[in-house]
A protein has these predicted regions:
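Bacterial N-terminal signal peptides that target proteins for export
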Residues: 1-8
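C-terminal motif of bacterial Sec signal peptides marking the signal peptidase cleavage site
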Residues: 15-19
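Start-of-domain marker
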Residues: 24-120
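Secretory pathway targeting signatures of secreted, lumenal, and periplasmic proteins
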Residues: 25-27, 41-45, 183-247
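Signature of long, low-cysteine stretches enriched in small and polar/charged residues
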Residues: 80-132, 239-306
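Short, well-ordered beta-strand elements
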Residues: 120-132, 208-214, 308-317
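Surface-exposed amphipathic alpha-helical segments
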Residues: 134-158, 186, 307-344
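Short conserved aromatic/hydrophobic patches within beta-strands of well-structured domains
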Residues: 177-194, 333-339
Length: 344
């Protein structure tokens, strides 16, 4: 835990570190950061990149995203040499600079934010030897991913605060008495006394979420089976493309060992977000009586004010393209939720 905290809070002047600092000569106003979401520019010279260090670094950054229909990495890696970086790409949104030198006393990862562009995170990973840096990655790889994920999440939330879907936020506030920050592009689709559905439609994809509440009746209400049952009841309100079709939760998946199917339940864990416990479910959805489907992630918490369970359920449909960059911003929605009556 101390290692995670160190990476999260350590901010140092890169000019004080060993080696050339390509930022020192750059002055002036901040530029808009370049690069795509979930893309990391790794500044690493050839010897280190071709060594076990480069192999381990790629393995960490390209860790598969859990519970997607196909394999997608946590981050796409773009590698560049220090020389090319200095002249071409110092304003990238996510930068990881690699420095291996015997002059470095201790292996560490340190962070700076908005160095020459905004929003930007610049991580410097340094150590005295390749072996020491590889071992550090084995121990702290998940923390490195966490820091980069938090940077992406904060960008989503800040953008929603500035460019929000205010009309939709108002509908949700009136229905559930919660505050949310929702980016422009999401449009209201349907509502009832205990349900709101919104989506962002693209020519080749759909990015949507629905919020619903239902009575809390003790521990039996929050078993995985009960949560999936509740999900299916509300998902029926999301129509499919043909008459009588509707969304539901996948219950069986192909067996990789033969041509049959096996029973499947969404993955479950409890996460604490802004001091509140949420039950996270990750699984797959499909359309009853039609051929559509994709990944979903839902977050359920107890709204003590009403004695009800509140769920934010996020789904993606993207049959031709990757799903990571559609699903991640939906996951970020829950980090912008607040319960005003509980905060008084």
């Amino acid at each position: 835990m101390k290692r995670v905290a160190y990476i999260l809070v350590s901010i140092v002047l890169l000019a004080a570190m060993v080696g050339c600092d390509s930022f020192r000569s750059l002055t002036g106003a901040k530029k808009t950061a370049q690069g795509s979401p979930y893309e990391v520019l790794v500044v690493c010279d050839g010897y280190e990149w071709e060594s076990q260090l480069g192999t381990e670094l790629k393995a960490v950054l390209e860790t598969p995203v859990e519970m997607l229909n196909q394999v997608e990495p946590m981050f796409n890696v773009v590698r560049i040499t220090a020389r090319d970086f200095k002249h071409l790409l110092p304003s990238y949104r996510n930068i990881l600079k690699v420095l291996c030198s015997p002059q470095v006393a201790e292996t560490s990862i340190v962070a700076q934010y908005d160095v020459v562009a905004s929003p930007q995170i610049v991580l410097t990973f340094q150590g005295p030897s390749i072996a020491a840096m590889v071992e550090y990655l084995k121990q702290n790889g998940s923390a490195l991913l966490q820091v980069l994920e938090i940077a992406e999440r904060n960008r989503t939330i800040e953008y929603a605060k500035k460019q929000g879907a205010r009309a939709l936020e108002k509908i949700i506030k009136e229905e559930f008495d919660i505050d949310m920050h929702i980016s422009n592009g999401y449009l209201f689709r349907a509502e009832s006394d205990d349900f709101v559905w919104a989506s962002n439609e693209y020519p080749v994809a759909s990015q949507g979420f629905f919020i619903y509440s239902h009575p809390f009746k003790g521990k039996a209400s929050v078993t995985t089976e009960s949560l999936v049952k509740a999900r299916n009841e509300f998902a029926k309100r999301i129509p499919g493309p043909t008459d009588g079709s509707y969304m539901t939760t996948v219950k069986r998946i192909p067996n990789v060992e033969d041509d049959g199917y096996v029973d499947f339940m969404p993955q479950r864990k409890v996460v604490k977000i802004n001091g509140r416990d949420w039950i996270e479910l990750r699984g797959f959805w499909e359309v009853e009586r039609d051929f559509m489907g994709g990944p979903f992630v839902s977050y359920t918490t107890l709204d003590e004010r009403e004695g009800e369970l509140l769920t934010i359920d996020c789904y993606v449909y993207s049959p031709k393209y990757g799903k990571r960059n559609f699903l991640r911003p939906l996951e970020h929605l829950v980090y912008g939720v607040s319960f005003p009556a509980n905060d008084k």
